[in-house]
């Protein structure tokens, strides 16, 4: 069965949308439409800018008028998000802050930030389903699927540019909380170890410390000690894939329930202690940045979920 958009749509390009390629713009306008179809309608000249045919690499300018034709899409593509409607609804409950420029949410553990790698649903797809009227919603940064906590989304292209610049210039501070094995030594305040990313034959990404890798630095502070574990605050100076997880492992203190870099005996200890923990104990607790619209310095905190809180309560009772 096919569905069809009702009519031709004319979109006027705002100043903060200028500079992006027409193919990327169409992907935000025609949600759920395959890239192959977008390139097909461009190639056929069905998409016009200022009544003229354009190439996929054309960069939009402020004031351009884009003609978007009705697009037929297989119903299954239109409804790709439908099995995840409960997750979409749940996203509305974890929004921490929102204005005209940004949206900040407390990402649940187990939800990917975007679809891909066999996943049809991610936070960004969920937000677009939740806010179908939004013209622009893009991730500013990423969190691993099993990591929970503060996730920043831009609602304007100008906001995305500003926040990406802050990331590049190290003007954004991220604080994570991690439960690690054993007693973290207080004098270990920084781990500097270059990280190299490898792709296994299975397609799985694995990161290891290697002199051939990229320079990487994480700062650590002990928050609380327990009988056989430590809660540490981790502040990455660089932003490498799996950085905190690999740096804690390298320091001899892997994170609880880390299926890639963890320690099964430590996980078993936590299970036997009755903590009820079944997920990676890595939580993006706070994010400090300069607001792209007002210039104000903001610090947004995300509370831990019930599972993490209960785990710490049990460990405190046994300390």
From Swiss-Prot:
Gene Ontology biological process: enzyme-directed rRNA pseudouridine synthesis
S4 RNA-binding domain segment(s): 20-83
Family: Belongs to the pseudouridine synthase RluA family.
UniProt-listed SMART domains: S4
Catalytic activity: uridine(955/2504/2580) in 23S rRNA = pseudouridine(955/2504/2580) in 23S rRNA
EC number: 5.4.99.24
Gene Ontology terms, MF aspect: 23S rRNA pseudouridine(955/2504/2580) synthase activity; RNA binding
Pfam families assigned to the protein according to its UniProt record, in alphabetical order: PseudoU_synth_2, S4
Active site: 144
Keywords, in A-Z order: Isomerase, RNA-binding, rRNA processing
Enzyme class: isomerase
Job description of the protein: Responsible for synthesis of pseudouridine from uracil at positions 955, 2504 and 2580 in 23S ribosomal RNA.
Protein name (Swiss-Prot/TrEMBL): Ribosomal large subunit pseudouridine synthase C
Taxonomic source organism: Salmonella typhi
Gene3D superfamilies in UniProt: Pseudouridine synthase (3.30.2350.10), RNA-binding S4 domain (3.10.290.10)
